[in-house]
Amino acid sequence: GRCFNDLHWFDLKSLRWQPQLTTSKSPMQRSGHCACAVDDTMYIFGGNTTKNSFNDLWEFDVLSSVWRQIKTTGKSPSGRVGHTITALGPRLLVLGGREYATNYFDCHLHSFDVRTRHWSQVPLHTSSPRGGPPPLRTGHCTTVHAGRLLLFGGLREDGRFLDDITTVELIS
């Protein structure tokens, strides 16, 4: 299939998709990336083409319609697909996914602070009886509730589907 780098908004009043014209260079076309918003800024991370996985982070200012590639510090996550990115205050949490070319599954929770532009890793602790990190996965969903990251489903390294809901304790 083909990858694109165009941007569309869904208008909640008209219930229609609208193309968004931008006034800057857009990220390279890709699929399998994730996006989330903090205030008036949308962030995208990762994704791939048929040849490459990306570990770049971009921001789109909704008010000015401008894309910017973010120059970061710290150890950024490897390029990946099938991951999630979830906003928790000024932090973006990247979890799971796999490198497209090697099928390497990542076992770390990565945190990006939108104020300092710095990546760090966060210890993974679950509320499950066995404790420790949740099983490696791709294609899952996450959301934040009451300061915890809720993780649902996905696909394991061995190809089996997961139907669990795991609470990840976010330790500062």
Predicted regions and their residues:
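Kelch-like beta-propeller repeat domains
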Residues: G1-S172
